[in-house]
């Protein structure tokens, strides 16, 4: 049994196309619909997203994911100046880059997923292939008590800690740790280095990505 991710804009009927879908982002339901717009338009008050109706399903998914990053930043007020005086602003190019990097989740060929595990053991982030290592025991513990892992962007490694001072780390925390480190990889490969200095920005995206992707999960025998 293997986890795969389906594109909600793919029609199950030949010669038909999906006109709209509802996706949960954070606690809110956002409606994504085809419309006569140049690219995408987001209405944060009505919580709907209009996507260019000439796009195919893959391009619609790419635009929906780009909208996801914009919406998360808006709903959580991530684009602002932080207490350390360092501004955080993801411009349109960065959003597009992040969404492109994130699209690999809908392409089976870009990651390897072991049987019955909650995260892959190899994954592409842009042109970099990251290998995930499960560490049996280390003395490291996050100051926030949540993230039990680290990533090496030179060697292309993500390390997930399986036990801490003799205590087994629960699968739910290991899964959240993977997403946390994956978001670090996203930002680094998109050259948005500020997120490496502001952990709660990474935490926010990691949590929202984990919840967002649950909507696309399906299981196949493979």
Give the positions of each predicted feature.
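Short pre-active-site segment immediately N-terminal to the catalytic Zn-binding motif
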Residues: 47-64, 155-177, 192
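Active-site recognition of the HExxH zinc-binding catalytic motif
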Residues: 61-74, 176-188
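Post-HExxH zinc-binding segment in Zn-dependent metallohydrolases
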Residues: 79-115, 190-222
């Amino acid at each position: 049994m293997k986890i795969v991710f389906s594109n909600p804009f793919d029609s199950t009927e030949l010669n038909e196309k999906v006109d709209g879908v509802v996706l949960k982002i954070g606690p809110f339901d956002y409606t994504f619909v085809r419309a006569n717009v140049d690219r995408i338009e987001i209405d944060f008050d009505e919580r709907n997203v209009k996507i260019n109706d000439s796009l195919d399903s893959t391009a619609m998914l790419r635009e929906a994911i780009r909208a996801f990053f914009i919406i998360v930043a808006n709903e959580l007020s991530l684009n602002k100046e932080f207490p350390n005086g360092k501004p955080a602003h993801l411009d349109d190019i960065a959003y597009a880059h992040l969404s492109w990097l994130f699209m690999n989740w809908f392409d089976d060929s870009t990651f390897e997923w072991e049987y019955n595990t909650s995260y892959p053991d190899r994954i592409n982030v842009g042109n970099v292939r990251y290998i995930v290592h499960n560490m049996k025991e280390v003395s490291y513990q996050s100051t926030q008590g949540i993230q039990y892992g680290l990533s090496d962007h030179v060697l292309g490694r993500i390390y997930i800690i399986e036990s801490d001072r003799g205590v087994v780390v629960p699968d739910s925390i290991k899964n959240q740790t993977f997403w946390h480190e994956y978001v670090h990889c996203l930002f680094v490969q998109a050259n948005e280095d500020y997120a490496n200095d502001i952990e709660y920005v990474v935490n926010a995206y990691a949590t929202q990505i984990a919840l967002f992707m649950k909507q696309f999960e399906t299981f196949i025998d493979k």
